[in-house]
C-alpha cells in the first residue's frame, strides 16, 4: 500500500510495506544500479510487467539493501511520483509526432544541499524524443523544484522507458514510462522480425518479415545509396490511397531506412510465365492483363508514372480465374509524380520494356508506361519475352536495335483485337497511343464476355433441359416471344455504349493510316450472339460490321473449339441483323421453318451466346430441323462450328485452353534495319492491306514504294562524286590576304589587257595620267604585237571554276611573262599602252603614245625599297615628267609581289573593269572557303580522337557510379551529334551509319573493347559494369560514325597530293564541296566543340 505525505501529493518510500516475494532477479538488477546492453532489456521486461505500486516497492527494497539500517532510512529527497503518464488514462494511446508534457516535484529533506541529475536509459532512443527542464541542479535545504518532462513519439511503437535520477549520497532512483502510440506510417524497426531474403529491388534487398504478427515485405535501403530513390518511392506510397491492384503500403522506418509493404505469397509473375509447370487459362491471362491496366489507370489518375513496368514487378495474388484480384503492381523505385511529359537527367529501368523516347531521349510521359504495357502484354499472352527474335544475334545487336527505336515483333499467335491494342501501344508517335482508361474499359468488356461465355458452357446443358421451349430464328421463344426478346435488346443497347469507349483506343492509332480499309478503322466488336464470328461484344443494331480476321479474337476461338469438341451436336445460333448475309432469304426462311429450342438467358449486362444442346432427347429433332433449314435457305444457315473451315478436320480436344492459336508458326524473322525509316503507320497499313483483294495489292505496292521513296528523300543522303558547277555565293571570312595576292595580280594584268569589249576609255594626253615615276619611252614597231600575243583570252570567270583551269591559267601567264621579259631586253625604248575604246576584238589596233621628251638617266647600281628599278635600253628618248600622284597600298603590294612582271604593267593606269572586280572577289571567296574547310576538318579530327579516348577510359573505371556517369556522357555526346546532323544537314542516323561504314574499311573505330579490371568489383557488380560498358561502346561507335561522316564531306581536294584522314587515303581529284555544305558542317563542329 502506498502512503502519501500530509500535503497529499508526495510518496513516502519509508512508509511502503516491504514485500519479500519480489523477484530476486529484478531485485538484483535494481541493486546493481548501472547496467547496460541485455541487462537493460531484461530489467524493462521484468519491471514493466508489474503495476506502478509494485515497481515502487521493488525500488524501495533495492535501496534499503544498499543502505541497510535498523531504523527506517531517512532520505534526503522526496518525489511526487515515480511514473510519467502524461495525463493519459490507462490504456489510452498517444498520437505520433505530438508533444506530450508532464511534471514532477523534487523536495529536499536532508540536512544540506541536494544535487540531482536526470538521464534516460538508454540515453539515445530513435523512437522517442525526451527532454527534462531542468535536467540537473542543486536543491537547497527545505526547498523543492519542479521538473518539466516533454516527450514526442516519433513512430508507431510501444514506449517502455526507464528514467534514472542520480541523487548525491542517495543512489539512483528509477522512473517509468509505459505508453502505446496510435497507428501511423512511421514504424519502429525493433518491432520487425526480419527473415530470409526474397528478392532485390532497384536499390536494396527485400526481406520477408513479421510485424505485430503480420507478414510483410521489408525493402532495406543500401547504405551506399544516397537516399533519393527511397524518398521518391516513399512519397509515391504516401500519395496513393488503397487500391486492390496496388501493393498495400504498411509503413517505413527512419533508422535504418526501409519500406514495409504487404507481403504477396505468390511472388512475381516472371517465375510463372517461364516455368513449364504452370499453365494459365485464357481467362486468367486476360484477367491478369486487366488487373495491370486497372492499377496503372489508378496511378495515372493520381498523376503518378510508374516507368518500370515489367513482369518482375507484377506480384501474383492468385492463379484462380474466380479470384477477385490476380495481380498487384509493386516497386515504385523509379516512379515519379508528374501531370505532363518531361525530360529527366538519367535513364534507368529495364532494357527490354523501355519505350523508345525514354531510351534515346529520356522523355518521360504516360505514353511511356503504355509502351511498356504493350511489351508486357506480349509476354503475358505468349510467354515470350520482347525482342526474343534477337537472341541469336547477341546483346550488342539488340542494344543497337533499341537505340534505333524499333518495336518488338508481335508474335503471330496474337490475333484480332488484342493484336490491335498492342500495335496501338507501340505507335511511333507517343501522342497517338491509347491511355489506360480506354484500355481498361476494353479489357473489362472482353473479360466479362469471356467469363460469361465460359459459365454458359458449363450451365447450358442443365438450363436447356429444364426448359424445353422452342425458338425461332429471331431468338425469341415461341411461347412468349415478347418477353424473351427484350433482354437481348436491352443488352445490345447497354453494350453499344461500351463500343463507343472501346473505339477510342484506335481512334488516335488509325488517324494517320490513310490506306486502312473501312472495316479496320476501329476496333470491331461484333455481337456476342453470333458464335460463328467469334466476337465478344454485340454490335449496334442495323450497322453491318464484317467479321474480324481469325474470328475476331483468338481467346474466343479457343473457347469455341472446346465447345464444339465437347458438344458435338450442331445447333443453329441466333442471328443478329448485322451478321446476316442476305436479308431477303433470312426473312423467308424464318417464316417457313419451325423454331428449335433455345437457351435461357441470364439478366446480365452482356448477353450469353447460345451454345450446342447436349440433350440426347432433342438430337433427332434438331437434325430434322437443320435439314429443313439447309434445304430452304442455305445462305442463312449458320452453324456454331463455322469457325473451322469445311475442309479442315476438327482438332482433338485439349484439356487445357491455350491463349495462343495452334496454327503452325514459322521461325520469327529478324526485321531489317531499314525498318527504321518507315513509321508504324506504314507497318499497320501493310498488315491491314494484306486482307484486301488482288486489285488492292497493286495499290499497296505503289503506296509502299511511295512511302519508301518519301522516307529516303527525308532521311537519306547519298555521296555523289559529281559536284554542282554553280557559283559559290560570296561569304565574308576573315583570313590572311598574303596567300592569294599574287594570283589576283596576275589575273588583273590579264584581264586589263583583254577587256576591251566592256571598257570605253578614250585615249588622253599624257598630262592627264598621274604617276609616281616618269613615263617610259614607247618601244618601236613589234612591241604591240608582242604584247597582244601575251594577252590571254579568258571567258567570264565564275567562283565555281575548277582548280585545274586555274593552274593552266597560271602556267600560261608565267609563259607570257617570260616572253615579255625577253622582248623587253631586246627593245631599246619603253612605251605605254593605252587601250582604245573603239576596238571590239583582239585584232583591233591599240593606241600607242610615245613621249618625245628625254628621260633622265637612272643608274643601274641604284636601288629603292619602294619602287623597282627600271631597265633602260640604249635608245634614250627625252620626255618630261608628269604630275606625281600617291600610290595606293594595293598597288605598292602588287609592285613588291610582281617583280617578275613587265615594267609596262607596273605603270599601267587603266581603271579596273567589272570583270576584274568579280575575279578578285571570287578568288578571295574561294580561298577563304578552302581555309574554312581545313579548319573545320582539323576541329572534327580533334573531337574524334578526344571522344575515342573517352571511350577507352572504361579500362580505368573502379566504381559502378563512375561507369554510369561515363556512359551517360557518351550517350549525351552521341545525342548532340545526332541532333546537330538532323538540324543542319536534315539527315537520319541510318544514312550516316551506312555512308560511314561504306568508306570505313576497318568496320569499327575501336579495335579492342576497353575492360575494367575485375579485381575492383565483386562478381555481380562487375557484370553490371560490363553491361553498361557494352551499351556505351555501341553508342560511342555510332557517335564516331557521325564524326567520320562529317569529315568525309570535307575531303581536301585543293592540293595536288593525297591527304590521309583516319587511315583513309583521299584522292586529289575530288572536287571541292559546295559552300553551303561546308558552312553547315562548320556550324556543327563549332557547336560540338563548345
Curated annotation (Swiss-Prot):
It is an enzyme of class 2 (transferase). Keywords: ATP-binding, Kinase, Nucleotide-binding, Serine/threonine-protein kinase, Transferase. It comes from the Eukaryota. Its EC number is 2.7.11.1. The active site is at residue 308. Disulfide bonds: none annotated. Residues 462-705, 747-881 are annotated as: Disordered. Residues 531-543, 657-666, 675-684 have a biased composition (Polar residues). InterPro entries: Kinase-like_dom_sf, Prot_kinase_dom, Protein_kinase_ATP_BS, Ser-Thr/Tyr_kinase_cat_dom, Ser/Thr_kinase_AS, TKL_Ser/Thr_kinase. One of its GO terms (molecular function) is protein serine/threonine kinase activity. Transmembrane segments: none annotated. Residues 192-443 form the Protein kinase domain. It catalyses: L-seryl-[protein] + ATP = O-phospho-L-seryl-[protein] + ADP + H(+); L-threonyl-[protein] + ATP = O-phospho-L-threonyl-[protein] + ADP + H(+). Residues 462-530, 560-593, 613-646, 685-704, 748-760, 780-825, 833-868 have a biased composition (Low complexity). It holds the Pfam family PK_Tyr_Ser-Thr. Gene3D superfamilies: Phosphorylase Kinase, domain 1 (3.30.200.20), Transferase(Phosphotransferase) domain 1 (1.10.510.10). ATP binds at residues 198-206, 219. The keyword Nucleotide-binding applies. Belongs to the protein kinase superfamily. TKL Ser/Thr protein kinase family. This is Probable serine/threonine-protein kinase DDB_G0278665. It comes from Dictyostelium discoideum.
